[in-house]
Amino acid sequence: MLLSVVSLVLLGAVQGSDNPGPSDVAIGPHKYNLFRWEVDHFLDKWVNKFQDILPWNSEPPRERRIAQAQEFFDLRSQIRDLERELADRNGPADIHERIDGLQRLVDDMQPDVEETIESEISSVLVEEGFSSRIGVIFPPVDTVFASSPGALIISPRDHIAQIESTLLKPGISGAVRGELEDLILREDNVSAIIVSTGGVATYPSVVSVSGSLRDALAITAHEWLHHWFFFQPVGQHFWDNADMTTINETAASIGGEIIGDRAFTAMTGEVVTREPSAEAEDPDAFDFE
């Protein structure tokens, strides 16, 4: 059931026209395959859970799982540093081998780290009263670390208002983004911008791990709140108008930071403080998350 309803939330942003024009044809190869994502990942959490309860698989202590999560993000940071060296052609001769070796390590760790992140977020949600009377969090926190899709945002030219959005494959180059934006402007007489995202509320959610442990916790909580909102009136009216979309995104952003920061403090002992925004937000500005 959850697979269908969460997919339906996003399909409003993914479906195309029955009579594709030049811009639709150009965008087509770059569209994110939401259905494929759901089929590939929907059962991952429950397969891992089943493996965990097998008698010969004992769950490591929480302290060890937290240390593994911190190591995972440290290794990810090392990979990014090496990739920058590779791009600048300033790295050592064995840089490819070093990247591959680190990547194998993080790939092996990833399922366990995802479970740790989900567990820590769930614990905070229970403390904050999101659980049922029997202590169950619904929907369960479920996330996969992956490259997050891009988003094509369409607006009228004479005022700022999101009238359409489409999820795109991650990793589209700046040159291709510019070509698509120019084509849409020329063919459809609307403004277009392609942006990157930190996560998407598929189920399980897509969460980018291009940042830190703290970032991943906040994004995971943000996307879970979208899942939870779906079963509340505020989420069921997400697509009614731009104001409702903004309300949903703002609530998920604020709540995601609070929940994520509390999970980060519980895991690391570090007290998190966030500086208040120095400028008032423009109510007509896009929120692309």
Question: What label would you give each PLM region?
Answer:
Residues 1-3, 283-289:
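Pan-zinc metallopeptidase signature
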Residues 1-131:
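N-terminal low-structure segments adjacent to metalloprotease catalytic domains
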Residues 32-37, 42, 50, 72-73, ...:
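Phenylalanine-focused residue identity feature
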Residues 78-82, 87, 91-281:
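Acidic/His-rich structured neighborhood in mature extracellular/periplasmic domains
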